[in-house]
A protein has these predicted regions:
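Short, well-formed alpha-helical segments that are part of the catalytic scaffolds
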Residues: 3-16
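Acidic donor-binding segment of Leloir-type glycosyltransferases
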Residues: 14-53
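Acidic metal-phosphate-binding loop of nucleotide-sugar-dependent transferases
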Residues: 32, 55, 79-81
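Glycine-rich, basic loop-to-helix element that forms the pyrophosphate-binding segment
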Residues: 50-68
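Short aromatic/hydrophobic "clamp" motif used to bind/position activated sugar donors
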Residues: 73
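Conserved donor NDP-sugar-binding/catalytic core segment of glycosyltransferases
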Residues: 81-132
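A short, conserved alpha-helix in the catalytic core of glycosyltransferases
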Residues: 89-90, 156-176, 181-210
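C-terminal, non-catalytic tails of nucleotide-sugar-dependent glycosyltransferases
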Residues: 100-101, 110-111, 129-156, 166, ...
Length: 251
């Protein structure tokens, strides 16, 4: 955590997103500057883990999950602002025992807050991942209109982003959480989903579980770069060929 204005908005979105679903907030801070001034104002009900150095997304996520006890775990980036009912929708999906992971339908911020190209403002940022003919994982329909029929048809997917991922704690424990082999982060969420799929569980995107994603806002503020190319090669060396060319199912 580091972009405290976004973290504040993220936290403020939780009550309406959860509705009558009880939840516990666990924040893992990777040695953010000026953090004490912010965290001193937090409610005492929030569990705070302060790392003495930037451990990266993977280890921070694992540490946060380990502190909790609930049967469901929601991994949520501090740069994601949830819409009302999003958490409740995801929790309800787990009434189906075949569901192992539930992802979200995330959109780019509107133009006045956009950090990227204006053409993507308010459009799809994430609605699941698939593989292309080369075995590379990519985000489905990124930059498309939210209400496009093909976007709305997405349901069962190969993987979802760890920016907003809910899973069963028993699966998380069996798998061992996110794999530290991916360093500070990138593709650990994909590998987690593939492990869940290998356990004969389904990965879905709930079209009604929505939110805004400012995509790596904190990492950009503090000049943290993710090893995209290296981790992509690592992912393909470990999983290449098992799920070839799944994108055709969504087009």
């Amino acid at each position: 955590m580091g972009k405290f204005d976004l973290l504040t908005r993220c936290l403020e979105s939780l009550p309406d997103a959860a509705g009558d679903i009880p939840y516990r907030v666990i924040i893992v801070d990777n040695d953010s500057p000026y953090r004490d001034e912010f965290y001193d104002k937090l409610e005492t009900t929030v569990t705070l883990i302060k790392n003495k150095e930037n451990m990266g997304f993977v280890l921070a996520s694992n540490a946060g999950a380990k502190r909790g006890k609930a049967p469901l775990i929601l991994m949520l980036n501090s740069d994601v602002i949830l819409d009302p009912g999003a958490i409740k929708r995801m929790v309800m999906d787990f009434d189906d025992p075949e569901i192992g992971v539930v992802g979200m339908k995330l959109r780019f911020p509107e133009l006045k807050e956009h950090l990227h190209a204006a053409k993507d403002a308010g459009k799809v940022q994430h609605v699941g991942l698939a593989t292309n003919i080369h075995g590379d994982f990519y985000h489905l329909f990124i930059g498309w209109d939210l209400d496009h029929p093909k976007v709305q048809a997405v349901d069962d997917v190969l993987a979802v982003t760890g920016a907003g991922l809910m899973t069963r704690r028993n699966l998380w424990v069996q798998i061992g959480g996110f794999n530290p082999i991916y360093g500070i982060g990138c593709y650990e969420d994909v590998e987690y989903c593939l492990n869940v799929k290998a356990m004969a569980k389904t990965i879905i995107v709930d079209q009604e579980a929505t939110g805004i994603h400012f995509t790596n806002a904190t990492a950009k503020e503090f000049n943290v770069g993710y090893p995209l190319k290296q981790n992509n090669m690592l992912m393909k060396s470990r999983w290449g060929g098992r799920y070839p060319w799944t994108c055709w199912q969504h087009h």
